[in-house]
């Protein structure tokens, strides 16, 4: 016998958990819609689109036993700060950022990054994967122990980080507040096995918990009972953008060795926004140098802003961000970079927009200062705003399922040009990172990857690329793929010129289960503006997921 259940009121807007997966959710617009035919993607009144119930559905829903559901996954965005002890009494303040998903009540897995924020090592940045065990002490307190395995380096990275492998273990406790997130503290130990950094220090951290709706594997929509009324699920507004920037430096800007800074630098990267309400948003962005004389420069900025509608399809956006930045000889001091600016966004279709931004960036502790001109291609979409309560498939009729895939990847570079690097020219370079794929059809996918060197005497080398791939099944278990990518790379003594790189890969994959696959890859990467040319051999572990976006 069924019983009516009254749903709780909608909770606060959850931050978008697809900071990594959203890099693949875009396509070029086909046409520009006329003003009188245009429906603004965030709603005609410039508010985030919400899934509305009809008048007949305005009462709490009734469930039956056969109603299939999806259990949302508890997820956390975590920020950590600690100060590492370097040789000769030097200190390096590091800011960490992690995205963690609960596998069960005791285990969390995710991806993360650490970047220098204070000291004299601006641009020292690492990327990697994170695992954490946790045990509840009481209703408000948790104990935890974690391990981060990553790769990277930066200013002085060759000496400090060696090949680039970073290991970080930590133990601590966390206090869970009901309304303001979680506060934690503990002790961590950081080691670069092939470098000279070995440091134990206290840390503090802040966590923002929320829930995301993902299904393991590529789930098919089950058969649904049309008599079951829909849950009042809402869609939260989000944006993802491909970004191109030009920095025009001030006359007083210098390089970190005291020599004059070149007049400009070009960057490429990605940006993700999540709206807290109809006007305010938070955002994170990451870019790397691909032109100029600062190859190896990278920035990861976090902040927020305000969107002011001008017409139904035009908006003015204001933002302010801060985060770690540096490398490539840029004089960012300890690494803290501040950025503020204005943007004019023009929608060209229901989901696509172009944005022109103008701003200023500065490193408060040193001479790095520039005007920033940016061009962005935005993709706008809605995600289910859910709590910890199981969600009925019947509630998702106004959402499309999206096929997603995350790959934990190892790629090794082998010399294809005698001048491909400035030291250890006969030694291969091994890289660790994450690749994310968004399937736009059964045979085509958008892809993005972020990799950093962990072995091969190339500590501080990093690359971030986006591109297009194709997938074809050979049998039920075997498949082949091809992909082409372009992006930015630098550091570690690899001769990438201004930083622009292009890569092509071919892969053979085997399905271990409905969700898990293993892939072997062969490819080629080169820098059009430099002597860097390398053959690529890789292996990756791929996990398939189903996500949901508003129709």
Language-model features, listed with the residues they occupy:
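Solvent-exposed loop/turn segments connecting transmembrane beta-strands
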Residues: 84-95, 116-127, 137, 155-165, ...
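Hydrophobic, lipid-facing positions within transmembrane beta-strands of outer-membrane proteins
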Residues: 75-77, 93-97, 113, 125-131, ...
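Outer-membrane beta-barrel "beta-signal"
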Residues: 38-40, 198-225, 239-249, 369-393, ...
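Repeated loop/turn-to-beta-strand initiation elements of outer-membrane beta-barrel proteins
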Residues: 75, 105-111, 139-143, 175-185, ...
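N-terminal signal peptide c-region/cleavage motif recognized by signal peptidases
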Residues: 27-29
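Transmembrane beta-strand segments of Gram-negative outer membrane beta-barrel proteins
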Residues: 65-83, 107-109, 143-147, 230-250, ...
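Transmembrane beta-strands of outer-membrane beta-barrel pores
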Residues: 81-87, 113-119, 149-155, 187-193, ...
């Amino acid at each position: 016998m069924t019983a009516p259940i009254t749903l709780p009121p909608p909770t606060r807007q959850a931050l978008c958990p697809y900071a990594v997966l959203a890099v693949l959710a875009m396509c070029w617009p086909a046409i520009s819609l006329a003003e009188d035919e245009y429906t603004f993607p965030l709603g005609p009144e410039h508010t985030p689109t919400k899934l509305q119930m009809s008048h007949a559905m305005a009462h709490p829903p009734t469930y039956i036993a056969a109603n299939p559901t999806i259990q949302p996954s508890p997820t956390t965005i975590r920020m950590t700060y600690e100060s590492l002890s370097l040789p000769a009494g030097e200190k390096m303040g590091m800011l960490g950022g992690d995205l963690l998903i609960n596998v069960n009540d005791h285990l969390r897995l995710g991806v993360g990054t650490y970047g220098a924020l204070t000291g004299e090592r601006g641009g020292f940045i690492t990327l990697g994967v994170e695992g954490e065990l946790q045990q509840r002490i009481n209703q408000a307190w948790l104990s935890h122990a974690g391990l981060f395995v990553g790769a990277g380096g930066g200013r002085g990275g060759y000496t400090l980080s060696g090949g680039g492998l970073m290991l970080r273990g930590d133990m601590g406790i966390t206090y869970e507040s009901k309304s303001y997130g979680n506060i934690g503290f503990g002790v961590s130990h950081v080691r670069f096995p092939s470098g000279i950094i070995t440091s134990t220090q206290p840390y503090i951290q802040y966590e923002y918990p929320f829930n995301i709706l993902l299904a393991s594997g590529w789930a098919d929509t089950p058969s649904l009972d049309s008599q079951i009324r829909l849950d009042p699920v809402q869609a939260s507004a989000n944006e993802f953008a491909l970004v191109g920037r030009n920095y025009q430096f001030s006359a007083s800007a210098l390089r970190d060795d005291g020599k004059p800074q070149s007049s400009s630098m070009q960057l490429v990267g990605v940006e993700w926004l999540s709206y807290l309400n109809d006007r305010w948003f938070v955002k994170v962005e990451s870019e790397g140098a691909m032109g100029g004389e600062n190859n190896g420069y990278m920035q990861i900025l976090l902040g927020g802003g305000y969107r002011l509608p001008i017409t139904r399809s035009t908006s003015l956006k204001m933002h302010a961000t801060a985060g770690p930045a540096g490398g490539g000889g840029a004089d960012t001091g300890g690494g803290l970079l501040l950025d503020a600016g204005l943007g004019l966004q023009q929608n060209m279709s229901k989901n696509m927009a172009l944005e022109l931004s103008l701003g200023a960036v500065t490193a408060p502790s040193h001479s790095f200062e520039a005007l920033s001109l940016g061009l962005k291609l935005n993709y706008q979409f809605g995600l289910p705003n859910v709590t910890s309560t199981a969600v009925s498939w019947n509630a998702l009729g106004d959402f499309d399922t999206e096929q997603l895939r995350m790959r934990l990847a190892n790629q090794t570079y082998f010399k294809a040009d005698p001048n491909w690097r400035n030291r250890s020219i006969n030694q291969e370079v091994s890289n660790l990172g994450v690749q994310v794929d968004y399937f736009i059809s059964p045979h085509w996918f958008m892809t993005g990857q972020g990799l950093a060197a962990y072995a091969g005497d190339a500590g501080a080398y990093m690359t971030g690329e986006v591109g297009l791939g194709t997938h074809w099944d050979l049998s039920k278990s075997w498949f082949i793929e091809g992909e082409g990518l372009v992006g930015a790379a630098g550091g570690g003594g690899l001769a990438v010129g201004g930083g622009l790189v292009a890569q092509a890969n071919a892969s053979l994959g085997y399905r271990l289960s409905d969700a898990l696959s293993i892939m072997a890859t062969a490819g080629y990467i080169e820098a059009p503006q430099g002597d860097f040319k390398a053959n690529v051999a890789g292996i990756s572990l791929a996990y398939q997921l189903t996500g949901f976006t508003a129709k």
